[in-house]
Regions:
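An N-terminal boundary/leader segment
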Residues: 1-93, 97-100, 317, 327, ...
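Structural helix-boundary/capping segments
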Residues: 1-5, 72, 209-308, 326-338, ...
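Acidic-enriched catalytic cores of C-N bond-cleaving enzymes acting on peptides and small amides
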Residues: 2-23, 269-289, 313-348, 365-379
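Short helix-loop capping/hinge segments that flank enzyme active sites or metal/cofactor-binding pockets
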Residues: 24, 28-32, 36, 117-140, ...
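Serine-dependent amide/ester hydrolase catalytic core
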Residues: 46-53, 310-313, 366-469, 502, ...
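Short, well-ordered beta-strand elements within core beta-sheets of diverse protein domains
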Residues: 48-54, 123, 141-145, 262-269, ...
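Immediate post-signal peptide segment of exported/extracytoplasmic ligand-binding proteins
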Residues: 95, 99-120, 291-303
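Short glycine/serine-rich loop/turn segments
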Residues: 115-262, 305-307, 442-455
Length: 521
């Protein structure tokens, strides 16, 4: 047993309990973004494409509608870092001109075969790089820096006809479970403005769930697509590593494990849109996923776990989330899936395995470097004192990330090696079991926590583990609309490498049961 982990876990549990009344007071008002009035903003990506192609809806009209909604909700959620509204409108008008000509020439279908997202607006996580827009990734030392090129996934979406509207907020260098930084401030959950939108793709999730974007290009290194999607009632897919290009992503690490842990993926409001978005974002690699191959749910084996750990270093999963995982598993059984009661006991040390493998990367960014002089490292305690007094160059969670990275949960070298060995065994076991199946697991220990409730940050281990296992996974909402005063609850659907289509097929089926995305109010 890792005794220091146990002690730290006990302290966090006690502290979380002591602070619970304070956070309850902060979230009791349950303020939300303004209601979504424009019915066009509820359309799926597929429906937008269909209506643009038929001429029922113009690219300019839908782009204008999304811009108006962004301007309406951003003062509440603080998700936008920099926009390109004028350029987007110009591009939309040009698309409409080209489509009118294609209709006259009888080539409208050809236009959409070449560009399957032609005229559809979308948004981009700042770290994924959009030409000419901010690329500071929440860091004071990079304030004013602009992206010189599009990131690989963004370039693929633009080549498919997508029209980018803006870049959205992230924590410093994407190293956080909450989207906050000293440069751009804190992004808020549209379902309850006193709660977290998750991280590190919280800006994307907050916009999309507000009805301010049909889909977004985001990234996931420890749950950064799935956790915000879960907190905001959306579908977020972390693909098999290497499928979608990560070129241009900030930060970039040289360690070989980085390209296995980091993936770029879509966040969307409708599960049915995920295959189309994956196909576009992946480019030529999409064929490896066989997304067009039908999935017979009767041949899919379903495993499920309501709690993946007995580690005292983690706070227990909420009862509501456990019940939803069981409900999802039973529904899939009723749909003809084979339901397995086998449990993967290796998950007992999910936190220790995740941390041991993740922090084994060699060049993780040092959040204590002085923004004014990167050769100087600031003292952790002095910087913490500055932050406590309302100053400092980093957010609280950036400093907590530094503590976690340097301490590695105070695990000994021998313990870390043991946990990495257990992780390898679990990976081999899951790759075999999930070759024709999926594993249902909570996406987090709770629904969206109050802003700043860092005592619950360890819950990110549920998503981080999937990254270090190098597996694909989809976050899916499991109660829609969430019963007031709750924020959305979600689970994640995990499968073996290159079996992404199984995750998505199950997510689409569960959308029928739980209702999928439901906007605030």
């Amino acid at each position: 047993m890792d005794f220091i982990v146990v002690i730290v876990g006990l302290l966090l549990r006690v502290l979380d309990g002591l602070l619970a009344p304070y956070y309850w007071l902060r979230t009791r008002r349950h303020r939300q973004v303004p209601p979504l009035q424009d019915a066009r903003l509820r359309l799926s990506v597929a429906e937008i494409v269909e209506r643009i192609q038929s001429g029922e809806l113009s690219s300019e009209a839908i782009t204008c509608a999304y811009i108006a909604r962004i301007q309406e909700v951003n003062p509440y959620i603080n998700a936008v870092v920099e926009d390109r509204f004028s350029a987007a409108l110009a591009e939309a008008k040009q698309v409409d001109i080209l489509l009118e000509e294609a209709r006259r020439n009888g080539k409208i279908e050809d236009a959409f075969k070449k560009k399957p997202l032609l005229g559809v607006p979308f948004t981009v996580k700042e770290s994924c790089q959009l030409t000419g827009l901010s690329n500071s990734v929440g860091c004071l030392e990079h304030a004013g820096r602009k992206a010189a090129t599009d990131g690989g996934a963004v370039a693929n979406v633009r080549a498919a006809g997508g029209i980018p509207l803006l870049v959205s907020n992230t924590p410093e260098l994407c190293l956080g479970w909450e989207t906050t930084n000293r440069l751009n401030g804190t992004t808020r959950n549209p379902y309850c403005l006193a709660r977290s939108a998750g991280g590190s793709s919280g800006g994307e999730a907050a916009l999309i769930s507000s009805g301010a974007s049909p889909f977004g290009v985001a990234s996931d290194i420890a749950g950064s697509v799935r956790l915000p999607a879960a907190y905001c009632g959306l579908y977020g897919h972390k693909p098999t590593p290497g499928i979608i290009p990560i070129a241009g992503h900030i930060p970039t690490l040289q360690d070989a494990k980085y390209s296995e842990f980091l993936t770029v993926g879509p966040i969307a409001r409708h599960a049915a849109d995920l295959p189309r978005l994956l196909d576009v974002m992946a480019g030529p690699n999409a064929k490896l996923l066989r997304l067009d191959e039908p999935v017979d749910l009767r041949k899919v084996k379903v495993y499920y776990m309501t709690e993946a750990t007995k580690s005292i270093g983690l706070i227990d999963v909420d009862k509501r989330i456990k019940e939803l995982v069981v409900s999802a598993a039973r529904y899939l059984r009723d749909c003809g899936c084979e339901l397995s009661e086998e449990k993967f006991t290796e998950f007992d040390h999910v936190l220790e395995m995740s941390v041991s493998e993740f922090f084994s990367m060699k060049d993780i960014p040092n959040m204590l470097l002085d923004p004014n002089d990167p050769k100087v490292e600031r003292n952790l305690f002095a910087e913490a004192a500055r932050v406590a007094c309302g100053g400092g160059a980093r957010s609280v969670q950036a400093l907590l990330f530094t503590v976690a990275a340097r301490s590695q949960l105070f695990l000994t070298h021998a313990a870390r090696a043991r946990h990495r060995d257990n992780l390898d065994k679990l990976r081999r076991k899951l790759e075999t079991a999930l070759s024709d199946g999926v594993l249902l697991l909570p996406a987090s220990i709770t629904t969206a926590p109050a802003l700043g409730r860092h005592t619950r940050a360890g819950g990110a281990a549920y998503t981080m583990l999937v990254n270090v296992l190098r597996l694909p996974a989809t976050a899916a909402p499991a109660d829609s609309p969430p019963p007031a005063p709750h924020t959305p609850a979600a689970l994640q659907i995990i499968s073996a490498p290159y079996q992404d289509r199984l995750c998505i097929a199950v997510a689409r089926e569960l959308e029928k049961r739980f209702g999928g995305w439901s906007p605030p109010h």
